[in-house]
Each structure stands twice: as C-alpha cells, then as structure tokens.
Amino acid sequence: MGLPRLVCAFLFAACCCCRSATGVPGEEKQPTPTPDPVEVEVGNTALLKCGPAHPSGNFSQVEWFLIHKERQIPIFRVHQGKGQSEPGEYEHRLSLHGPGATLALSQVTPHDDRMFLCKSKQPRPQDHYVQLQVYKAPEEPTIQANVLGIHVDIQELKEVATCVGRNGYPIPQVIWYKNGRPLQEEENRVHIQSSQTVESSGLYTLKSVLSARLVKEDKDAQFYCELSYRLPSGNRMKESKEVTVPVLYPAEKVWVEVEPVGLLKEGDHVKIRCLTDGNPQPHFTINKKNPSTEEMEEESTDENGLLSLEPAQKHHSGVYQCQSLDLETTVMLSSDPLELLVNYVSDVQVDPTAPEVQEGDSLTLTCKAESNQDLEFEWLRDKTGQLLGKGPILQLNNVKREAGGRYLCVASVPSVPGLNRTRRVSVGIFGSPWMAAKERKVWAQENAMLNLSCEASGHPQPTISWNINGSATEWNPDPQTVVSTLNVLVTPELLETGAECTASNSLGSNTTVIILKLVTLTTLTPDSSQTTGLSTPTVSPHSRANSTSTEKKLPQQESKGVVIVAVIVCTLVLAVLGATLYYFYKKGKLPCGRSGKQEITLPPTRKSEFVVEVKSDKLPEEMALLQGSNGDKRAPGDQGEKYIDLRH
C-alpha cells in the first residue's frame, strides 16, 4: 500500500471518530422524556392525553402503546379522527374522548397503574408518555388487642395489638399511637412489624403488629393505629378505635370495701368485698373478730369472694379484715381492720301490754326501746294515723268509748334515716255494746237473696245474733268491733216483719232494727228505645247511731200517659194563645213596633194541626221527678228530652 492510500485511510478513520464523538445533527439518541402523571381512583375513568393541546389535524394518525417490561404493546389507533381498539385486555375499555387523540380508560383497576405511550406521525414523528397513577382508599382499620394480658415482669417484648387495613392502593402507611402520642421503634421497648398481601383485585391488605414491654402505669393506656394514604384530592388518614390491654402486676396493698356507703341500719342489704391494687385480683379470705376469743375467724363468701349480709342485723357489727394470697409470688397481704357498725332499734315494748279502763277513767301508756343511738318516740292512732303526742309516755284522760282500739308507738333514730320500730297496743274501754245504727231501711226485691249487715263495738268484744235464719259471716276491724253479714231470702213474711240483730257482751246488749222496703220492677212501654229493670241493692251503712244518716229514697212511679196528656194540654193552650194574638193583630188592636201598625203579609192560613211527639230515655223512676213536692205538674220544657212540632 502506498503512502497516499495510508494517509487517506487515516483521515477517513479520524473523520469517523470525530463524527462519533461530536455527533451529527439529526442522528443523536433522544432520551426518554418525563411522562405526564394522570391520577385516578379505582372504578373511575382516566383521560390519557396525547401531549399538549394541538389542532385536531395534527392527530390524523396516532398510535397508543402500553409499556410493559420495556416492550411497546399496541392498544389503540387513531386515523382520520376515528379510533380503533387493538385486541387485548384494553379492547373494551378504551374510547376516544372528544376531538383529537385523548383516550378514555373506563373502570380503572390497580392493574392499570402503568406507563402508556402516544406516537403521532404528523406533522412529524413525536412520542408522548403518560404515567397512570391509581389510588384506592383502604377500608376502616380494625384493631385487635391482646386479651390475655402482658405481665410487667416479663423482659421480652409481647404483642400488644394487631392493626389491619384492607383493600387499599397503593400500600398505606401505618402509625401506632399510645394515649394520643405516636410510637417509634425503640430497642427492647417498642417494635412495629408490618406486612402486606396483594389481593386478586390488585388491592393491598396491610397488617401491622405492635409489640412492646408494658409497665404498671400502662394499665389504662389507650392504643390505636392510623392509616395514611393518598388520593387524587390529597393526603388522607383513617383511625381505628381505641383499645386497652390487660396489664398484669402483683398486688402491693389490700383493703376492705363495704356497700352501701354511709350509716348502716338493720334490714339493709350489706355487701363486704376485698380489693387490691394488683391485677388480676388474688384469692381473698374475709375474717371477723370473735368478741369472745378476740380471734379472727373466716366468714363464708360466695364464689366471687363477696360476703353478703342480707338483711343486716345488729350481731353483724364487728371488726372485719381481708387477706389475699398471690399464687405466683406466694405473698400474703392483710388489710387494715375495718369496724362495721349496724345501727339498730330493739323490739319496742308498751306497758301495760293489754290495757283496759272504765269509761271516764284515765290511762297512762309507756313505751320503751333500746338502741345504740338516741331515740325519739311518737304515738299514733292506728285507725286514722293521727299523731297523738311525742315522747315515751301517752296520757289519756276521761276516756270515752270511742277511744278504744289500737294505738301505735313508733321508736325512731333521727340520725339514721329510715331506722324505726313500731309496737301496736289495743286499748279496751269497758262498756255494753253500741251499734253503728239503731235503725236502718234496706230496699229489697221479693224472692231475691239479700245481704244484711250489722256492726257493733264494745269491750269485751260483743257477739252478734239475728232473729231470722240465714247464712252469717263475721269479721273484726279491730279488737272491740265486730261486723256480721247475713245472707237471706226475701220472703213476704220477712218484708212484713223486718230483721233484728242483737249485740251482747257481759256488760249488756243492744239492738239494730232493719226495715225492708219492697222494690217493684217497672218495664218501659213497648215503643221505648230501652228497657231497664231495677236490681236489688245491698245496703250496708256504717254510720254511728249518734250521727246524721241519709237514707236513699227511690223515686215514685207515675204513669207515662199522664206526662203525655200534660204535654198535649200545654200545647193546646199555647195554640189558643197564639190564635188570639193573631186575631187582635188583624183587627188592628195590637200595635206592631214603635211606629204603630205595620202591614205584614202572612201565608194563607190552614186548618190547625197539632203534632206532638214525646221522646224520653228516662227510667220510669226518674219520671217521678216531674212531679213537684205539692203534686203540681212541671212545665213541659222540664220533662226530659222531647220536642213539639206545631204546624199552623
């Protein structure tokens, strides 16, 4: 090879090297441009734009590609403003959106979080990349606490709670909180371990486990987790509910607790329990000091270690103490002694226990009781509740027979509300029987059963006898009163003779006369709208003989025809009066108005017609009310519900 050829070859090689080093316009390698991000939520429609806005003519021929593993997979073509999907996974979800080459991707899923490429060939070849970013908010986080508890003496980390956030995209971030403060990883104190699972839908399920060492002060701590995630609209977060974790620690102190709190009295439902500052509560025993031996003796409790005093009595008073045994540490703890006081009032006694006195004499009643507190006494009349006096002594002077009966002595403790005891005593006033009524009238229906009653009082308590046969029953409202009820058949003889009840005791006797009045049943006329009968009454008055008693009078019966005749007569009188006034008016003898006679045109007179209709729903016995006390008839307007139609 000659020298000229070597020189030429050298120059050619140098030119090639220089071209390669310096580059030639139009032949340099273009770097991949930064893709345009498009954010969309799962289930919505994403709009993929092919670069900046240009006239529609610039996109007469466009191709869309999916970038998958550095390969360009065609998915859509645009030619002359018309689009066509390529077969594949996007075949049925892509469409043109408006003029140009903007694609609408419907029903976005997490699998669509990819890079897309738009290639346009006019006016010059141009590539435009779009990065589709898909988001989905996770569900509300759930949290599960450790229910078995964590012992403070264990040195290794124990699981506190587990937080789960389901169906989010992309993977949310989890933050743990204790009492509102975020927890950070801390060696030998706090550890957070998170894992995620990809569901078939492409969504993520996040699981985070919080482990920690707890101390006694964490027994009331509130733990919860927070999920932080992003949406196209911005950053969001969701919090779980708060949970507490049982913290186990040994007891250091034990004490006695009594319910109810405050002053106790006999009859209360009292509960005694033992408590400690440890968790869980250890096994307890409740002991009470024996006042005789001064030794503590164990009391019987239920399965929960509760001692129930139901009802509390004065012998339940005393000194109580709790003891606890920690089975893990075998440490025995004892509480401070607690003195329980059950306030009481002993059985009330009245002296004399069965007082008896002659009418007109005086009587002194004395009430006694015992209590651990100061007492107050009150005297009441049992029958009426009337307060007779205060103090342990009740003095009754110049007693009357009405003073006989039961009295109450109430012994109470003012300092302990509701603590009182009562004693009843019956006072007997010597005397012959006295009757509730000397004479009574009872309405009866013949051949019907009737109850006759008789009441008498006295001391000694009287007995009652009847002068007629029947079934008698007795009861005693108080120790010196007796009430007898006799069930008899009303016969004509009984209506004629009546009945007598006699009360007698060792001091005398007394009688009540019962007069029977016959009640007749009256039926309304057939045109009446109702038919009413009068039932036989049972009369049992209890008014005293010296009081004014009012006997019920049955209305007298009167024929309904008399009422109708009275109405017709009154109607005729009114008609005649009206005709007379009209006659004087026509003759001009009756001035009309202040200006004298005025002409009034009346319709032609017709033959007078009187139509009288009387309607009444009154009972026959109520019709007797139409009759005055002197036998005069009342005006028709007072005779109940009726109307009169007068036609002229």
From Swiss-Prot:
Biased composition (Basic and acidic residues): 631-648
Positions in the Cytoplasmic compartment: 582-648
Signal peptide: 1-23
One of the GO BP terms on file: vascular wound healing
Modified residues (Phosphoserine): 608, 616
Organism domain of life: Eukaryota
Domain spans labelled Ig-like C2-type: 246-332, 337-426, 432-512
Membrane-topology annotation of the record: Single-pass type I membrane protein
Function noted in UniProt: Plays a role in cell adhesion, and in cohesion of the endothelial monolayer at intercellular junctions in vascular tissue. Its expression may allow melanoma cells to interact with cellular elements of the vascular system, thereby enhancing hematogeneous tumor spread. Could be an adhesion molecule active in neural crest cells during embryonic development. Acts as a surface receptor that triggers tyrosine phosphorylation of FYN and PTK2/FAK1, and a transient increase in the intracellular calcium concentration.
UniProt-recorded name of the protein: Cell surface glycoprotein MUC18
Record organism: Rattus norvegicus
Native organism taxonomy: Eukaryota, Metazoa, Chordata, Craniata, Vertebrata
Gene designation per UniProt: Mcam
